[in-house]
Amino acid sequence: MDSITTAASVVAAGLAVGLGAIGPGIGQGSAAQGAVEGIARQPEAEGKIRGTLLLSFAFMESLTIYGLVVALVLLFANPFAG
């Protein structure tokens, strides 16, 4: 593999994981904030709010996992390497 392609792949893999985690991280923080506020306002709805929160966390975390998969493909099965 060419050294420039290798270096670009490593940088791209790092960016894929790093940038792929920023959005879900911010989203999880704001979702948790909303859930805590909702539970504080209506303690009797805690179970329903918690279930919805955990489901939304799973969907948000899948975006981070997609970034990780892209990074692993770039590092170990690089389609750009000749």
Swiss-Prot record:
Gene3D superfamilies: F1F0 ATP synthase subunit C. The chain crosses the membrane at residues 7-27, 57-77. The keyword Coiled coil does not apply. The keyword Ribonucleoprotein does not apply. GO terms for molecular function: lipid binding; proton-transporting ATP synthase activity, rotational mechanism. It comes from the Bacteria. One of its GO terms (cellular component) is proton-transporting two-sector ATPase complex, proton-transporting domain. Keywords: ATP synthesis, CF(0), Hydrogen ion transport, Ion transport, Lipid-binding, Membrane, Thylakoid, Transmembrane, Transmembrane helix, Transport. InterPro entries: ATP_synth_csu_bac/chlpt, ATP_synth_F0_csu, ATP_synth_F0_csu_DDCD_BS, ATP_synth_F0_csu_sf, ATPase_proteolipid_c-like_dom, F/V-ATP_Csub_sf. F-type ATPases have 2 components, F(1) - the catalytic core - and F(0) - the membrane proton channel. F(1) has five subunits: alpha(3), beta(3), gamma(1), delta(1), epsilon(1). F(0) has four main subunits: a(1), b(1), b'(1) and c(10-14). The alpha and beta chains form an alternating ring which encloses part of the gamma chain. F(1) is attached to F(0) by a central stalk formed by the gamma and epsilon chains, while a peripheral stalk is formed by the delta, b and b' chains. F(1)F(0) ATP synthase produces ATP from ADP in the presence of a proton or sodium gradient. F-type ATPases consist of two structural domains, F(1) containing the extramembraneous catalytic core and F(0) containing the membrane proton channel, linked together by a central stalk and a peripheral stalk. During catalysis, ATP synthesis in the catalytic domain of F(1) is coupled via a rotary mechanism of the central stalk subunits to proton translocation. NCBIfam families: ATP_synt_c (TIGR01260), PRK07354.1 (NF005608). This is ATP synthase subunit c. It comes from Prochlorococcus marinus (strain MIT 9211). The gene is atpE.
